[in-house]
C-alpha cells in the first residue's frame, strides 16, 4: 500500500478485529487503504462475516458499522462475494464438489475456508434478496446519503478518480 502512487482498494476486505479470519484484514491495513483514498468492500461470505455458520443481518451490519467507525463512511463499500456453491443456489453435493476442487487445486485452504454449506447472512441470502440491506442500514440509523455511498457511491467516486 505504501508503494502505491494512487488509490488502493480492498474489494473484499473485512475487519479481522471483528471476525478473526486469515482472509480478513488487520485494522492498520484498512486504515492505510482509506489514507490512500480507497474503499474497503465488506464481503458477506459467511466465514468472513461471522463465526456462526448461519450469519445474521446484524452480523453484516456489525461489520459495516465497525469499518465505518474505523475508516469513515467515504471508505466503505460492498464487495458481497456471492458465489456459485452458496446454499440455495446449488445442491449440497455440487457445493461439496466445488469445495474439494478448490482445496485440492491449492486455491483454498481448509484452515481459511470451511466446508459447505455456505449460508449468506439472513435476509440477504441470495442476490435476489440483497436489496434488504438498504432497509437494515436505514433502521440502524444510516442516512440515505451514506447508504448510497456504501451501496456504490464510493466505488463510483474511485472509478471517476482513476479512470476520469
Which residues are covered by each model-predicted region?
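Sec-exported extracytoplasmic/periplasmic mature domains
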Residues: 5, 34-35, 65, 69-72, ...
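Active-site glycine- and acidic-residue-rich loops that bind
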Residues: 14-24, 49-62
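A conserved active-site cap/scaffold subdomain adjacent to cofactor or substrate pockets
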Residues: 34-57
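Mid-to-C-terminal alpha-helical segments outside catalytic/metal-binding sites
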Residues: 113-164
